[in-house]
Each structure stands twice: as C-alpha cells, then as structure tokens.
UniProtKB/Swiss-Prot annotation:
It comes from the Bacteria. PANTHER family: REGULATORY PROTEIN SSL2874-RELATED (PTHR38449:SF1), REGULATORY PROTEIN TM_1690-RELATED (PTHR38449). This is Putative regulatory protein LBJ_1616. HAMAP family: RemA (MF_01503). InterPro entries: RemA-like. Belongs to the RemA family.
Amino acid sequence: MSQFSVLNVGFGNIVLVSKIVSIIHSDSASAKRIRNEAKSNNSLIDATQGKKTRSIIVTDSNHLILSNLRVESLAKRIESSDNSIASEEEDLD
C-alpha cells in the first residue's frame, strides 16, 4: 500500500501535496481574478467554513481551494509534514 502525503488546509479538510501547484495570498488582484474565473467554471472549492480566506491553493487540475490558513502556515505544514491543528492558525471568529 502506498503512502500519500496530505496537507490539512483547515477544519479537517485535506489536499494531496502531490496535486498542489502553488499556494498564493488571497488579497492580490490576480488572486481575486482567478478566484472569480474558478467560480464561474465551477472549479472553486471553499474550505474556509465561512471564515476569512487567507490563501488560495492551486492544484494541477486547475481547481482552486480556499483556505483560512496563512500561506506561511501551510508552507510550514508541508515542510515539516506536521498537519496538527494549532489553535492560533485557525481563525475562530
């Protein structure tokens, strides 16, 4: 049985690390543009549970996954292979 490396993107939602192309900040103009395009193409996945979107994960299938975790937090999780949920990383508002 093969082992898959996964990334917890918040609230128990996971993404296969091998499918991630990039992780970008959600507040740039280009991020907003590709987010609107993905929404119109039905390729937008919202994993924020209604919280503020802080990062956008782009996959190799051109799907966009919205996360409430910061880009830096997601990168740290990938680098350390640590997918435990720290309370300061998830916005509880």
